[in-house]
């Protein structure tokens, strides 16, 4: 019966993980792109 309390936490945690993962992937992608452009 704790679905109402667990679901919002899971949603916030899911949004936080994606919110941190997307900028990290784009940041690593830009670094790798700069490395390939320099070489």
From Swiss-Prot:
GO MF annotations, alphabetized:
electron transfer activity; heme binding; iron ion binding
Q: Cite the record's note on assembly.
A: Heterodimer of an alpha subunit and a beta subunit. PSII is composed of 1 copy each of membrane proteins PsbA, PsbB, PsbC, PsbD, PsbE, PsbF, PsbH, PsbI, PsbJ, PsbK, PsbL, PsbM, PsbT, PsbX, PsbY, PsbZ, Psb30/Ycf12, at least 3 peripheral proteins of the oxygen-evolving complex and a large number of cofactors. It forms dimeric complexes.
Give the residue spans that cross the bilayer.
Answer: 14-30
- Topological relation to the membrane, as annotated: Single-pass membrane protein
Cofactor(s) needed by this chain: heme b
* NCBIfam families with a match to the protein in the record: cyt_b559_beta
Q: Name one GO cellular component term.
A: chloroplast
Task: Supply the alphabetized keyword list.
Answer: Chloroplast, Electron transport, Heme, Iron, Membrane, Metal-binding, Photosynthesis, Photosystem II, Plastid, Thylakoid, Transmembrane, Transmembrane helix, Transport
* Location of this chain's protein in the cell: Plastid, Chloroplast thylakoid membrane
Co-factor note (free text): With its partner (PsbE) binds heme. PSII binds additional chlorophylls, carotenoids and specific lipids.
Q: What does this protein do?
A: This b-type cytochrome is tightly associated with the reaction center of photosystem II (PSII). PSII is a light-driven water:plastoquinone oxidoreductase that uses light energy to abstract electrons from H(2)O, generating O(2) and a proton gradient subsequently used for ATP formation. It consists of a core antenna complex that captures photons, and an electron transfer chain that converts photonic excitation into a charge separation.
The cross-references to InterPro entries, in alphabetical order and at most eight, read:
PSII_cyt_b559_bsu, PSII_cyt_b559_CS, PSII_cyt_b559_N
Domain of life from the UniProt record: Eukaryota
What SUPFAM superfamilies does this protein's entry cite?
Cytochrome b559 subunits
What the entry lists under Pfam families is as follows: Cytochrom_B559 (PF00283)
A biological process (GO) of this protein is:
photosynthetic electron transport chain
The family note in this entry says: Belongs to the PsbE/PsbF family.
Any idea what this protein is called?
Cytochrome b559 subunit beta
Which residues of the sequence carry a binding annotation for heme?
18
């Amino acid at each position: 019966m704790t679905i109402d309390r667990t679901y919002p936490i899971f949603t916030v945690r899911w949004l936080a993980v994606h919110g941190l993962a997307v900028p990290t992937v784009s940041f690593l992608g830009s670094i790798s792109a700069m490395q390939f452009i320099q070489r």
